[in-house]
């Protein structure tokens, strides 16, 4: 894996999320491309809201001129991005994307191996819950796998594969494995939470056989009950694990999760979440 994108609102850079991004780049000896979304043409946020966002990111701006405010924040955040990358021994590349944010991100993802984004990234004039509409659209339309960044990063303990026997959940497992061969020594947990429609014994055997060709330490956990609540109970304590989930479609989560299951997971867990779709 050579091209990793870090997507951010140019006005507000989540510096803490860069720790995980730099960890990945160090692991794979990759450069990190910072995608700074300037949203110059259809800015819906008033100056007051932009100033609040900038302040949350550590920048105190005095001007009420939207263009001047954006330019100052973009310049300061690009410098911060470069400083953090240099501190971590990572080569940081900057793209200033000045068009429509969603369109810019999708085009960038077409020519990348992996995209990293914070679940709170938003260009709406209204306060939004997590994940925001912008992030949900990115998950649905991105043309490479996406990782929802953790709030903070203190190291990687285990990989958690969510599995229900469907092709999309297996596709996500395979995509993660192909992108992260350096993690073959990391313990893998295959988690299945089902209230019905269990994977067949033959399917589970084939998955085990495939996983043993790629990983050295594998655990299997099967639980009964309500998928949404049981899944959250199982994932929340895993503070140093990365969670791998299947396809995120615009109308449905076509693996273990439907939209009512996916949203609570992305809202509540603080771990990195890897999402891939066909």
Set out the residue ranges of the language-model regions.
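Gly/Ser-rich helix-loop-strand patches that form or flank binding pockets
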Residues: 14, 18-20, 25, 94, ...
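Conserved beta-strand termini and adjacent loop/short-helix elements that scaffold enzyme active sites
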Residues: 35-37, 95-99, 149, 191-193, ...
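Small/aliphatic-rich secondary-structure junction motif
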Residues: 1-61, 141, 154-222, 240
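Structural beta-alpha unit
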Residues: 42, 68, 72-115, 213-243, ...
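Short amphipathic alpha-helical segments at helix-loop
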Residues: 62-66, 97, 161
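A short acidic, glycine-rich active-site loop
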Residues: 56-73
